[in-house]
Amino acid sequence: MPEMFRYCGQVFQVHKRAHKTCDYSTQYPYRTRWLANTVHLQTRCDGEAHDGCQAGCLLYWKSAWLKPLGKRRDSNDRKGTQAPSFPGIVPVRSQGCNETAIWDRIRVTDPVGGSLTYICQMTQVRQATSALAWWDVRQYLEDYTSGNVGIATLCKAFAYSVYYHLSQAGIGLGPAMRWFYDRVNPLRGGTLFPRKPGEIPEGSPTPSGLLNLRPGELVRVKPHLEILKTVDSSNRNRGMYWDAELVPYCGGAYRVLKSVTKIIDEKTSRMIEMKNPCIVLDSVICRARYSPCRMLCPKEMYPYWREIWLERVEGQAGDGPSAEKSMRLSVREDRQGQKTIPQLEIKR
């Protein structure tokens, strides 16, 4: 995509191996799909070439577009077009392209209705991937062997998944298991049971709150139980879903990264203009810990927050974790037992 051009020639460390990724083009619950020969670097799309889409998606990089440091070749060396070899990634030979062709493919206008649709990495996930069953154990082995997550994170994710499915099995254990989770897990530094329904009856209006937040302001995420008072029994506030992946951030203090008013819808490939702006918080990402059909997905999408779920913090952060501390702790936890991650240069 044109948004990737500015990274060419720069050096980055591999952030995650993108052997699987979430597919948001289908109906909920979303699922993961296999993705070959791809990694994530710490690079995000700024949406400049896609009419200012503000989703800020983590970019996918094919191995053919990268080369390991220490193995640079002269630009006149034709062998330099060969894809590098990384552990667990099958090299493929590039077929070639040019910037004009890329620019020509980012917008498509319907010749009949005149509606505009967009082509980007996110709208093409289904075309670039293959089906992956949530129970396919190979994906979890690669989560660990690739260095995406450590053994502790993997075990915690499996433990929660088993616990959750037992609580939902309809054998009469659900209420007791959720009560036990709420009493014991906070003693271990964890959260309340993350998948609780909202308190407002479905179909009833949900409240709004307006803080007029600006980038750089410090906010605190309200407690989980307080947020449940603002969402209906399907966990939505004016259409926006309150997801279990947001629960670990409750009580934490974070900087506002941006206010989001428009994004490209991955289902329709059309630009969505939001009726109510939502907030993205710095260093706050989806870690796919509590989503059984997409567990440990490395996509790291930015979650969206209603302002009514946040409260402005005057001065410095309080007793909740800061964004920087939260990110350091989560990365450290994710990467316990990881192998050394290589640095790569993006080809020009």
Language-model-detected regions and their locations in the chain:
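Generic structural signal for buried aliphatic residues
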Residues: 216-220
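Basic/aromatic-rich interaction segments and small domains that mediate binding to polyanionic partners
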Residues: 1-87, 93-97, 101-185, 189-215, ...
